[in-house]
């Protein structure tokens, strides 16, 4: 099908999201198969999944990057992004949700809501992404569809509404009752799920299905309270309500974020995936339903509102960078307004840099097809952009707009890295530069005292995979040190400084004079540097140099050399010399001034605190809690179900190295654990002294 056939109302930009191992990628593979995009089903456990195209993904059976593809169903074009479920790759989920219009949340029928399900659900809430839920793995031992629905309500605060009633469970799962059409769907095993039979609802389920359908209708009546005719029918003649009426109200409720309909199935056993495809088209929003896109005009500071129209001015967001050995740098974009043509010149308004598009590519995992243009609602990739990174806005040169950026969390773990030979040094620098462009949560810095290169990321798996990619993709041999905690520094009170940088050694000298005021910024807000210079006491051409110097000064703290965070700096006064002042002098002076001010502002060291979830047999609960307490953990609460207990805690990352090994020995290998970064907190004084000594 050509793209010209699709109006905006027939486009769906959706993500598939879940906890690791809930079956996201398998669900996506079945969608590709049924929609005719692939002619053979790829299996994750065999390393053959189309969407898991990186070697590391196929070996480890997990999704690391967000793969994109397009399928066609019920006369609509569906752009799908399959996202990772592992906490170390949370930025992949964040940047995908930022550009999507809707999402399918996949849950395991046995486990229900798991820790990473909560994380991705929160991320979707943040961007207001409408969702439907798919309870997968109904064929597993212990599968409980209604238990999963209940856990969505309890743990996510979701208004989860069952639209199916399973027929059988575990190995006896043969299909489901569709509560909207009031038909029982039985899947024929010999057709790989492509065919099913519609039958009457089995007698033993009729009463339960009547109750569930009535609950569904009553919930829908609260979605659209202005629709009095629908409410009246629900109260007086529910049997007269048509399927079309239900779909119309359901769609409205989903788009407004008031309800989350829940389907069931088994992607691996080919049951229920086409029904999921149907509701993606019927209930999830098109770009039109998501409304106008808001941004800011950087020159005037005014809010700009653009309609999703292909004839409007261009507004697109770069949400991912990928390096390809043959094509080079590929930038993934979502177009919110206007049309982008191959060969056109555009503006990166975030950086105020002109860019030129050399090629446009439609992606299917790592395969690509050349395109002449992308228009509003499209998700695609372009080649030729030199300056654009994740979160940058691309627009027309004469109509500047900057869209909301994508926030990247602070890394929590560091490793030293060095090339194995001199020949690897340049290749290592290129690899680190390319990988940090691709991934905003991967940072590269230099330890000022030792001169070592330090790489920082979201966890051991994150850095392990990036190291693996350096060897395979960039052919770099490197030695890495042990993982270390990525500490930060901050200040606890306001302070100021007055610094002069004067050098006289014959000929032209160096002169700069800078006065700063600093104060603690809101936790998590990052560093802010502003100029309050008036009257030209520092000429305006030198102000950027002072700001650059201050920013560089904040990169290494005053206690133990860790980067400073959450510091607000105001440049308030200074002076210059007609001959001796230069950009370099003001940059050095800015760096010295901020260090001096920070020393007087009662600096402290911050450590990453992890949100830890442990699921353990109840007879080991006391040992697990005792062990977490010994690790300076704070127990937030515990829940019990089926002889298992779930413990939620906040524990400093420095205490969690080797935790899985110790947990296995404590519980004879019967407990599981997940952890994700929660926030940074001040370290106890005794530990701070030990860190500074090191």
Swiss-Prot record:
Matches recorded under InterPro entries: EFG_II, EFG_III, EFG_III/V, EFG_IV, EFG_V, EFG_V-like, EFTu-like_2, G_TR_CS
Biological processes, Gene Ontology terms: ribosome disassembly
Signal peptide interval: none
Domain of life: Bacteria
Chain ranges of the tr-type G domain: 9-288
UniProt keyword annotation of Nucleotide-binding present: yes
SUPFAM superfamilies linked: EF-G C-terminal domain-like, P-loop containing nucleoside triphosphate hydrolases, Ribosomal protein S5 domain 2-like, Translation proteins
SMART domains registered for this protein in UniProt: EFG_C, EFG_IV
GO cellular component: cytoplasm
CDD domains: EF-G, EFG_III, EFG_mtEFG1_IV, EFG_mtEFG_C, EFG_mtEFG_II
Positions of GTP binding: 18-25, 82-86, 136-139
Pfam families noted in UniProt: EFG_C (PF00679), EFG_III (PF14492), EFG_IV (PF03764), GTP_EFTU (PF00009), GTP_EFTU_D2 (PF03144)
NCBIfam families for the chain: EF-G, PRK12740.1-5, small_GTP
PANTHER family referenced in this protein's UniProt entry, alphabetically: RIBOSOME-RELEASING FACTOR 2, MITOCHONDRIAL, TRANSLATION ELONGATION FACTOR G-RELATED
Protein name per its UniProtKB record: Elongation factor G
């Amino acid at each position: 099908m050509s793209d010209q056939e699709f109006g905006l109302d027939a486009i769906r930009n959706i993500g598939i999201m879940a906890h690791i191992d809930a079956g996201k990628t398998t669900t996506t593979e079945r969608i590709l198969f049924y929609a005719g995009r692939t002619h053979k089903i790829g299996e994750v456990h065999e390393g053959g999944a189309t969407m898991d195209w990186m070697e590391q993904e196929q070996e480890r059976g997990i999704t690391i990057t967000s793969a994109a593809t397009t399928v066609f169903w019920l006369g609509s074009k569906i752009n799908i992004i399959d996202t990772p479920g592992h906490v170390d790759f949370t930025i992949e989920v964040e940047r995908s949700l930022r550009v999507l219009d809707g999402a399918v949340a996949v849950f395991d029928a046995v486990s229900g809501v798991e820790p990473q399900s909560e994380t991705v659900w929160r991320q979707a809430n943040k961007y207001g992404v409408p969702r439907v839920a798919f309870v997968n793995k109904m064929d597993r031992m212990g599968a409980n569809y209604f238990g999963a629905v209940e856990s969505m309500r309890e743990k996510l605060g979701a208004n989860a509404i069952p639209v199916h009633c399973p027929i059988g469970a575990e190995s006896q799962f043969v299909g489901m009752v569709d509560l909207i059409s009031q038909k029982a769907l039985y899947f024929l095993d010999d057709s790989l799920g492509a065919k099913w039979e519609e039958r009457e609802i089995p007698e033993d389920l009729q009463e339960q299905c009547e109750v569930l359908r009535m609950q569904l209708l009553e919930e829908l009546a609260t979605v659209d309270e202005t629709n009095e005719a629908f409410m009246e029918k629900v109260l007086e003649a529910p049997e007269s309500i048509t399927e079309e009426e239900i779909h119309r109200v359901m769609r409205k409720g989903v788009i407004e974020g008031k309800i989350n309909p829940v389907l069931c199935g088994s992607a691996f056993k080919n049951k229920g995936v086409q029904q999921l495809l149907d509701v993606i088209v019927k209930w999830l929003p098109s770009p039109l339903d998501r409304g106008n896109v808001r941004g800011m005009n950087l020159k005037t500071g005014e809010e700009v509102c653009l309609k999703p129209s292909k004839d409007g001015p261009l507004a697109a967001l770069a949400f991912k960078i990928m390096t390809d050995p043959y094509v080079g740098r590929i930038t993934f974009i979502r177009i919110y307004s206007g049309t982008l043509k191959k060969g056109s010149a555009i503006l990166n308004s975030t950086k105020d840099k002109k860019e030129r598009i050399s090629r446009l590519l439609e992606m299917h995992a790592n395969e690509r097809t050349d395109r002449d243009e992308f228009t509003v609602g499209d998700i695609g990739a372009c080649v030729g952009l030199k300056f654009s990174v994740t979160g940058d806005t691309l627009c027309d040169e004469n109509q500047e707009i900057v869209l909301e950026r994508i926030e990247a969390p602070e890394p929590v773990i560091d490793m030293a890295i060095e090339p194995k030979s001199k020949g690897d040094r340049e290749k290592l620098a290129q690899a680190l530069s390319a990988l940090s462009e691709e991934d905003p949560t991967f940072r590269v810095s230099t330890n000022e005292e030792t001169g070592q290169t330090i790489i920082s990321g979201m966890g051991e798996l994150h850095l392990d995979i990036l190291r693996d990619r350096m060897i395979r993709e960039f052919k770099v041999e490197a030695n890495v040190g042990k993982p270390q905690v990525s500490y930060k520094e901050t200040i606890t009170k306001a302070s100021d400084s007055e610094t002069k940088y004067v050098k006289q050694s014959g000929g032209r000298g160096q002169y700069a004079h800078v006065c700063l005021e600093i104060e603690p910024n809101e936790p998590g807000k990052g560093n802010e540097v502003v100029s309050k210079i008036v009257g030209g006491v520092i000429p305006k051409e030198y102000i950027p140099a002072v700001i650059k110097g201050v920013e560089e000064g904040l990169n290494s703290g005053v206690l133990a050399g860790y980067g400073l965070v959450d510091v607000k700096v105001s440049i308030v006064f200074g002076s210059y010399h007609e001959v001796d002042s230069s950009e370099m002098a003001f940059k050095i002076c800015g760096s010295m001034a901020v260090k001096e001010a920070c020393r007087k502002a009662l600096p402290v060291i911050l450590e990453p605190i992890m949100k830890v979830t442990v699921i353990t047999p109840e007879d080991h609960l006391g040992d697990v809690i005792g062990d977490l307490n010994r690790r300076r953990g704070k127990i937030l609460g515990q829940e019990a179900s089926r002889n298992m207990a779930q413990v939620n805690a906040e524990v400093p990352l420095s205490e969690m190295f080797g935790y899985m090994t110790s947990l296995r020995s404590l519980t004879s290998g019967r407990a599981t654990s997940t952890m994700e970064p929660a926030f940074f907190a001040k370290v106890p004084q005794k530990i701070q002294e030990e860190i500074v000594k090191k």
